[in-house]
Structures are given as C-alpha cells and as structure tokens.
C-alpha cells in the first residue's frame, strides 16, 4: 500500500513496513549572501524498535513538530532517539522537548558533550549512519530504507542535484566528496532545509 499526503510543511509515506514522516521541511533564507532565517528539516522514522527524530529544528518550529507527531498519535515523550546530523543551533533547538530520548551525534562536532552519545554506539538494524563531513567535520547522515536524511551535507535541493557544496562549509573538498557519496546511494534525499529530492532525479 502506498499512501502519500503532502501539504505545506508535512508529508507522510507509508510503503508496507516503511514509516518515515517529514515533520518540517526546513527553510533557509539569504539576503545578499547573509543568512536571515534558518530552520532545519525534522524527520520522524519509526522502526520496529525505535521512534527516531533526525534533527529537531529551531524553537519556533516546536508546535509544527508536535502537531506532526500528534497526527500519528505520538507525543515528544514517545520519542526514543534523537539523531543530530550536526550541532548547529538550527538543527538542535528542540532537543529539550524530547525528555525520554537518547541523543546521538558525532564527537567531532563542536559542542558535543555529556548530553550526547557517539553515533557509532547507536544500534538499530533498520538504520545506518554514515559520515558526510564538509559542512562541519562531524556531519553525519541517516539511512533508512530508500531514504537518506543528510542535514546540511545538502542544505538545499540544488546542492545534491547540481553537486554544489554548501556555501557554509569547513572544507569544500570534503563537502563535495560527501555529496558524491550521497549520490552513489541512489536513495531519496531529505535535505537540511528544503524538503526532499526523489532518487529518480539523481540518476
């Protein structure tokens, strides 16, 4: 069965046992090259063993995230795991609402502390986490079935579509290599700030 519901900020895909929901697709606004507004995407993944959030976006998106969860009869207290693709503020500000979650990130990230576990310790047979550095040295991406949530390895659709490294990066060469790695996966890409790029566009 395939059920797809799309509207302004939410979409949901159920394909057999696949459950992934984009709670918020993200936004990135620049004026004259200066970032004026940045809120990351936030993705819910439900596996047999865990309710997982990948990135929690900014505080002003809290109600959108909670509403998206409620549509599946979930609340923040039902989330077992939060995986942060990196630790920039626009990807982590709602972490505190997930009171029962264990938080995972890369120890290479500036800001990694005792609130986080090393992502390599996370175990779920349905999830693979890979390193995709460039935007930051510790950037990671989360693979689930036919989807990969990439954070700011590809903040916007054109980054992955046209193989353009993100403007904000610590190492442009690493960023490009990460984009190549993501393309080779041949999966639907959930970007950091602009929703989804379907794999058919990446062939």
From Swiss-Prot:
Lineage: Archaea, Methanobacteriati, Methanobacteriota, Methanomada group, Methanococci
SUPFAM superfamilies (alphabetical): Metallo-hydrolase/oxidoreductase
Organism the protein comes from: Methanocaldococcus jannaschii (strain ATCC 43067 / DSM 2661 / JAL-1 / JCM 10045 / NBRC 100440) (Methanococcus jannaschii)
Cofactor remark from the record: Binds 2 Zn(2+) ions per subunit.
Protein name per the record: Probable metallo-hydrolase MJ0296
Residues that bind Zn(2+) 1: 86, 88, 135, 152
Cofactor(s), names only, from the UniProt record: Zn(2+)
GO molecular function, one term: metal ion binding
Top-rank taxon, per record: Archaea
Coiled-coil portions: none
Enzyme Commission designation: 3.-.-.-
Enzyme class: hydrolase
Residues annotated for Zn(2+) 2 binding in this entry: 90-91, 152, 193
Keywords carried by this UniProt record: Hydrolase, Metal-binding, Zinc
The family this protein is said to belong to: Belongs to the metallo-beta-lactamase superfamily.
